[in-house]
Design a protein with these regions (language model features):
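Asp-based, Mg2+/Mn2+-dependent phosphohydrolase catalytic module
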Residues: 1-16, 107-111, 124, 128-233
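N-terminal helical cap/lid subdomain that shapes the substrate entry/recognition surface
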Residues: 1-100, 104-112, 128
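Conserved phosphate-coupling serine/threonine residues in phosphotransfer and NTP-handling enzymes
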Residues: 120-122
């Protein structure tokens, strides 16, 4: 069943920007443990007064650090944190799987001659290992990871970068993701979004971030594209 969210507007879609884990792949990654490890490093620097916990989002934790310590210390902590996370991403990539029907959906969209890009907060190494395991390493027209941009979702930078790589205007694309940060990043970059409650967030929680559309899964995407209209001749 389709669940239309807030708007009923017709678009001519030429490209799809997708999140990876939680959207098309099952990817078990313990971000809490990575945050716990970096907070131990922070505590040794006598910075616990910043009131940070391992339950904070990665984005918020790094933002809080950046606002409260000098640039050199922040760069060092960020590199350590990304190192911790990359270790876990590499391990998790070995067990990554596609959601049922995701491959068929991707192939259908490719058959419609739509450009397809990935934008993820994962590392380049972890992302490439995951896509290679799933035999999708040469499938996407563009892949932007946290290593490719100074910003992370929910900031607009990574989305703008993938659109630039695809040579697509924001109004000619749609972003699909399972997280509130995907919806926020789409809004920041000026393109419509579709939420899928196949990750940590329920449909109700995603709707609070006001996506343009809410789908049951990525497998509903072809029907949405048909509804919106594509660039097919």
């Amino acid at each position: 069943m389709f669940n239309w969210a807030l708007e009923d507007r017709r678009l001519k879609i030429k490209a799809i920007v997708m999140d990876m884990d939680g959207t098309i792949t099952r990817f078990n990654l313990d971000f809490v443990e990575a945050r716990r490890r970096v907070l131990r490093d922070v505590e040794q620097m006598n910075l616990r007064t910043l009131d940070m916990t391992e339950q904070m989002s990665t984005y918020l934790l790094l933002k809080r650090l950046k606002e409260n310590i000098d640039a050199d210390k922040f760069d060092g902590i960020r590199k350590k944190f990304y190192g911790y996370v990359q270790e876990m991403e590499v391990r998790a990539a070995q067990d990554a799987t596609l959601y049922p029907g995701a491959l068929e959906t991707l192939n259908l969209l490719r058959g419609w001659r739509l450009k397809i890009g990935i934008v993820t907060n994962n590392s380049r190494v972890g992302t490439e290992l995951t896509l290679k395991r799933l035999r999708l390493d040469n499938f996407f027209d563009a892949v932007v990871t946290r290593d490719d941009c100074d910003e992370m979702k929910p900031d607009a930078g990574p989305v703008r970068k993938v659109l630039e790589s695809l040579d697509i205007r924001p109004e000619d694309a749609i972003l699909v993701g399972d997280s509130i940060i995907d919806i926020m990043a789409a809004k920041a970059a000026g393109l419509p979004s579709a939420g899928v409650p196949t990750g940590p967030f329920s449909g109700e929680r995603l709707l609070q971030t006001e996506p343009d559309y809410l789908l049951n899964s990525v497998n509903d995407l072809p029907r949405l594209i048909e509804y919106l209209g594509t660039s097919m001749q």
